[in-house]
From Swiss-Prot:
It is found in: Cytoplasm. It catalyses: cytidine(56) in tRNA + S-adenosyl-L-methionine = 2'-O-methylcytidine(56) in tRNA + S-adenosyl-L-homocysteine + H(+). Its EC number is 2.1.1.206. Specifically catalyzes the AdoMet-dependent 2'-O-ribose methylation of cytidine at position 56 in tRNAs. S-adenosyl-L-methionine binds at residues 82, 112-116, 130-137. It is an enzyme of class 2 (transferase). This is tRNA (cytidine(56)-2'-O)-methyltransferase. Gene3D superfamilies: 3.40.1280.10. The keyword Zinc does not apply. It comes from Methanococcus maripaludis (strain C7 / ATCC BAA-1331). Its main location: cytoplasm. One of its GO terms (cellular component) is cytoplasm. GO terms for biological process: tRNA nucleoside ribose methylation. It comes from the Archaea.
Length: 179
């Protein structure tokens, strides 16, 4: 199963920091690609620097129409929309994992930066809430991906990484490859 993240409504200068965090969280917790509906050189360069240093295969893509992309994806994939108005994650997560496992389909996860168009709710196979109180989309994304992978991606490492961290009780243990 490949996981892709579709970021709706990125607002340039206003959202560059949070959108960068969305991308980094996506990568760190197992996604293979993040898709934006507007190009942002700052976010793209930040993602590319992280991939260069920390390794792995994570792609940044821009699409003209999120609707077209989602419809095409849905033909052979499962679409989950994270929204505080959706079904309770505690009640629906097992069903989502089973659906993915049974069908062997890829996953497109939709998260919004601003008000999400009604059509996103209609296109989604699942509208899922991670709590029903206001919070960051980064928090919702992290919780969802961790639950989806059952914690298996928390300590991912990549063979091509130039920087690696070893968990330690009392000190920083960082390996940095010299050029």
């Amino acid at each position: 199963m490949a996981i892709e993240i579709l970021r709706l409504g990125h607002r340039g200068e206003r959202d560059k920091r949070i959108s960068t965090h969305v991308a980094l969280t996506s990568r760190a917790l197992g996604a293979e690609k993040i898709i934006f509906t507007e190009d942002d050189k700052h976010v793209k360069e930040s993602v590319e620097r992280i991939v260069e240093s920390w390794g792995g295969e994570f792609k940044f893509e821009v699409v003209k129409s999120w609707r077209t992309y989602t419809r095409r994806f849905k033909d052979n994939g499962i679409v989950v929309h994270l929204t505080m108005y959706g079904e309770n994650i505690n009640k629906i997560m097992t069903e989502i994992r089973e659906d993915i496992s049974k069908t062997n389909k890829n996953l497109l996860l939709i998260i919004g930066a601003e008000k999400v168009p009604r059509e996103a709710y209609d296109l989604a196979d699942y509208n899922l809430s991670v709590g029903n109180q206001p919070h960051s989309e980064v928090a919702a994304l992290a919780i969802f991906l961790d639950r989806l992978t059952e914690g298996k991606t928390l300590y991912s490492e990549y063979d091509d990484a130039k920087i690696k961290v070893t968990p330690s009780k009392s000190e920083k243990c960082v390996f940095v490859e010299k050029d």
